[in-house]
A protein has these predicted regions:
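FAD-site-proximal beta/loop scaffold in flavoenzymes
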Residues: 132, 137-163, 235-240, 246-328, ...
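Glycine-rich Rossmann-fold phosphate-binding loop(s) that bind the pyrophosphate
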Residues: 16-19, 44, 148-149, 169-174
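FAD-binding core/adjacent interface of flavoenzyme oxidoreductases
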Residues: 1-10, 15, 70-165, 240-242, ...
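A Rossmann-like FAD-binding core segment of flavoenzymes
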Residues: 38, 77-100, 107, 184-280, ...
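Beta1-alpha1 glycine-rich phosphate/pyrophosphate-binding loop at the start
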Residues: 2-82, 179-202
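Mid-to-C-terminal Rossmann-like scaffold of FAD/NAD(P)H-dependent oxidoreductases
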Residues: 7-11, 296-426, 453-475, 520-522
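Local cysteine-cluster metal-coordination motifs and their immediate loop/turn environment
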Residues: 463-477, 493-510
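Immediate flanking context of iron-sulfur cluster ligation sites
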Residues: 453-464, 482-499
Length: 522
């Protein structure tokens, strides 16, 4: 570029304003300030980006709407970013590179990033009929809601305040976490699920141990196939099961899973499978000017030799991988558009690349007080499976609410299930992510949760990951506390630890307490 020529900023449009989009916007702020990017963010909800994972905590009163916010609209606008809330996109006009809104306005782009997330599944039940694929809570009968956004949280909070029995439909991790959160705060809760036990597909026999723990937490657990809902005076009154059984309640929370939002991509003829198909650079397949990140994206690298992708990866529904994608796209945009090979980013650190040979598979962790469950990798094999190099060790202690399963190939941990043993689960996660071999005596790992193990266990080292969502190590949190952070909120503001699922909050508090206990002792 001729130095005398005026700088023409690249027009970047981000469709969606959830946690993943907010992360990308942070990366692009320096480019906006430098005049190299004209950024427009189109959010469908009336609220700025917030941590959707913690919506259930808002519903039960554990935290506030303000506390889970991830972006300040006024601050972003003052930076020069065009943030539009309540903006609904009608379609994408690819030939003319513009996004058409339902109000008739057109927003032009040079680069388009789709961060449309996922929508809750509306089960096909009598009494819940509505437009196919609709996730509009306004189209649900009174007393019925999802638990996906702040509007849903307000609906559930009102039901709890009225001391109504909450019926949660869905035995997956979202339904279980919602049921536990409500029960822990004194709510009367019934969990209705399909199959023998909640989370049976993921946990196998460990699901039966989990079901016992849920009952001990005060939740009524009902197995059955739902056929419809019943209304009284126009308001939800119960769920009808096969066989005529009715589960009564004053409010129904639908937690039947989510599906990627792909309608905009389909409408402009982008390649779509479960999600919007993207290559390993997160560009929409066959496109030079469109990217997709987060729950709506499905990685399908066309390069068979690409070790980073290793085939197709469906949307994971986890906030950590979405943030990593936002980091990757943000870094690429900075390198392309900064004009000097890159603009130094200040503030939060991105989750570090684990490097070759280190596992990046998602680990699913149940986040609840006093009920622990974790699952990762391949878990279908049983102890009697005969296959070269494969070994499966399994323990069950239903009387004490404990279950563990370890799957190894040539001694290396490739899959795990752990229920009711938090220390064992944490150690297995560490071994799984490192691709480590297990000790010859697998049962030695179970001792971590014994009375003797609790007394002799040493704390994790500084290099251990404390916050899985943001990829923050224990050492980074320790450094922030030593520098003056005295609360989880302080640590989150400096390191981003704790801003994802919230499952590491107790670990952050422990680091803070240990720091000040040592200071007093000295």
């Amino acid at each position: 570029m001729n130095p005398s020529e005026p700088l023409v900023p690249s027009r970047v449009v981000v469709v969606g304003f959830g946690p993943v989009a907010a992360r990308l916007v942070e990366h692009l702020e320096p480019l906006v300030a430098a005049g190299r990017v004209a950024l427009t963010v189109l959010g469908q909800e009336p609220d700025a980006a917030y941590n959707r994972v913690l919506v259930a905590d808002v519903a039960v009163g554990r935290t506030s709407e303000a506390a889970i916010g991830l972006a300040d609209t006024d601050t972003l606008r003052a930076t020069g970013i065009d943030v539009r809330l309540g903006a609904r996109v009608d379609r994408i006009d690819r030939p003319f590179r513009r996004v058409l809104l339902t109000d008739g306005e057109a927003v032009d782009y040079d680069r388009l990033v789709l961060a449309t997330g996922s929508r809750p599944v509306r089960p096909r039940l009598t009494g819940l009929e509505g437009p196919a694929g609709s996730d509009d809570a306004h189209l649900l009968p009174p007393g019925v809601s999802f638990l996906r956004d702040l509007s849903d949280a307000r609906t559930v909070a009102a039901a709890l305040a009225a001391q109504q029995r909450i019926v949660v439909l869905g035995g997956g991790i979202l339904g279980i976490e919602a049921a536990l959160a409500a029960a822990e705060e004194g709510g009367r809760v019934t969990l209705v699920h399909h199959g023998r036990s909640p989370m049976e597909r993921l946990l196998g026999d460990g699901a039966r141990v989990l079901a016992t723990a849920l009952r001990q937490a005060g939740i009524t657990v009902v197995a059955g196939t739902s056929t419809g809902i019943e209304l009284e005076h126009g308001h939800f009154a119960g769920v009808r099961l096969e066989g005529g059984v009715r589960v009564d309640g004053g409010a129904l929370v639908l937690a039947c899973g989510v599906r990627p939002r792909t309608e905009l991509a389909e409408g402009c003829d982008l390649a779509v499978a479960d999600g919007i198909l993207v290559d390993h650079t997160l560009r929409a397949v066959g496109m030079e000017d469109i990217w997709a990140i987060g729950d709506c994206a499905e990685v399908c690298c066309l390069r068979s030799s690409c070790r980073a992708c290793a085939g197709a990866t469906a949307p994971q529904g986890l906030i950590g991988p979405g943030w990593q994608q936002a980091d990757d796209v943000g870094a690429a945009f900075v390198a392309d558009l900064s004009g000097d090979g890159g603009v130094p980013l200040t503030g939060f650190r991105s989750a570090p690349d684990p490097g070759p040979g280190v596992r990046r598979d998602p680990v699913v962790v149940l986040k609840a007080r006093g009920v622990d469950a974790v699952v990762a990798g391949e878990t279908d094999a049983d102890p009697w499976t005969v296959e070269p190099g494969l070994a499966v060790a399994e323990w069950a202690d239903p009387g004490h609410g404990r279950y563990a399963k370890m799957v190894t190939r040539d001694g290396v941990l490739t899959g795990l299930v752990c229920v009711g043993m938090p220390r064992t689960g944490a150690e297995l996660i560490l071994l799984f992510e490192r691709g480590s071999e297990l000790p010859a005596d697998r049962s030695s790992l179970l001792r971590l949760d014994s009375a003797e193990g609790l007394l002799t266990a040493s704390p994790p080292g500084p290099a251990a990951t404390l916050c899985r969502c943001a990829g923050v190590t224990r050492g980074t949190v320790q450094d922030s506390v030593a520098a003056g952070c005295t609360s989880v909120q302080d640590v989150s503001a400096v390191t981003r630890a704790g801003t994802g699922c919230g499952g590491c909050h107790d670990g952050i508090r422990a680091v803070i307490e240990q720091h000040f206990a040592a200071a007093v002792a000295s």
